[in-house]
């Protein structure tokens, strides 16, 4: 699982892992699993029905670090520098949130950031991660409109400033909304190919969306949907 891969792989000197686990009203795990015996692991029980934004907020509030990384449980890391490379981007004060190159199980790109044109879509989905891409877009860190909540790093202070992840979204788009809220504070969303994270549950953006979620995203940030200052059509 992701916890084992983090502990075995990561070269970052000081980190904790907060595992948000689903429990029932009696405090019993809904989906039992075992974790390594490691003092860096903290459990945060979540006893509500599934709600991604609420779980993200719950995990962030249970953590203690100045920088927080949200990771889906269907991700996997195999490069020591995956964490240091995304956290390192936050040394730039105008960057609010950072994401890695997300990979499909076969090594192709799952997401190289998210474009808002013509509607929220994963950039370079299905393309080779071994290629530099059009104009080198796969080889350099750059600004994007948004990134996936499957893996994103941000400062706790900025999380608090924008009120965390909006819990008004039922299924999708709370991650994009978070990036938009940071942008409204003058903070950029960055993506770096120097950090690569597998996302086994990767799907086409919007494949499981709730229509009301998209309507809410459109009502809040519709002025940005349909245009993108950072993406090109063949990126």
What are these regions (language model features)?
Residues 14-24, 42-46:
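Short beta-strand/loop segment that forms part of the nucleotide-sugar
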Residues 82-86, 138-163, 168-198:
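A short, conserved alpha-helix in the catalytic core of glycosyltransferases
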Residues 96, 106-107, 118-143, 148, ...:
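C-terminal, non-catalytic tails of nucleotide-sugar-dependent glycosyltransferases
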Residues 68:
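Short aromatic/hydrophobic "clamp" motif used to bind/position activated sugar donors
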Residues 4-14:
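Short, acidic, metal-binding catalytic loop of nucleotide-sugar glycosyltransferases
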Residues 21-32, 76:
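A conserved acidic beta->alpha catalytic loop
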Residues 46-63:
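Glycine-rich, basic loop-to-helix element that forms the pyrophosphate-binding segment
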Residues 75, 79-118:
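Conserved donor NDP-sugar-binding/catalytic core segment of glycosyltransferases
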């Amino acid at each position: 699982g992701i916890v084992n891969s983090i502990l075995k792989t990561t070269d970052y000197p000081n980190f904790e892992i907060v595992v948000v686990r689903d429990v029932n009203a009696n405090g019993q795990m809904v989906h039992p699993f075992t974790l390594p015996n490691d003092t860096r692991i903290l459990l945060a029980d979540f006893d509500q029905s599934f709600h991604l934004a609420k779980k993200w907020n719950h995990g962030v509030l249970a953590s203690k670090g100045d920088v927080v990384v949200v990771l889906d449980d269907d991700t996997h890391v195999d490069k020591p520098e995956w964490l240091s490379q995304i956290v390192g981007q936050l040394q730039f004060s105008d960057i609010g949130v950072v994401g890695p190159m997300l990979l499909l199980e076969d090594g192709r790109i799952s997401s190289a950031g998210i474009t808002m044109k013509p509607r929220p879509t994963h950039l370079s989905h299905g393309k080779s991660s071994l290629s530099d891409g059009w104009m080198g877009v796969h080889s350099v860190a750059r600004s994007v409109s948004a990134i996936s909540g499957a893996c994103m790093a941000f400062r706790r202070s900025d999380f608090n400033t924008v009120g965390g992840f909006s819990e008004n979204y039922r299924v999708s788009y709370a991650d994009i909304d978070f990036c938009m809220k940071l942008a409204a504070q003058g903070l950029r969303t960055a993506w770096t190919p120097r950090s690569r994270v597998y996302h086994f549950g990767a799907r086409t953006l919007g494949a499981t969306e709730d229509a009301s979620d998209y309507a809410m995203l459109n009502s809040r940030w519709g002025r940005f949907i349909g245009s993108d200052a950072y993406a090109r059509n063949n990126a």
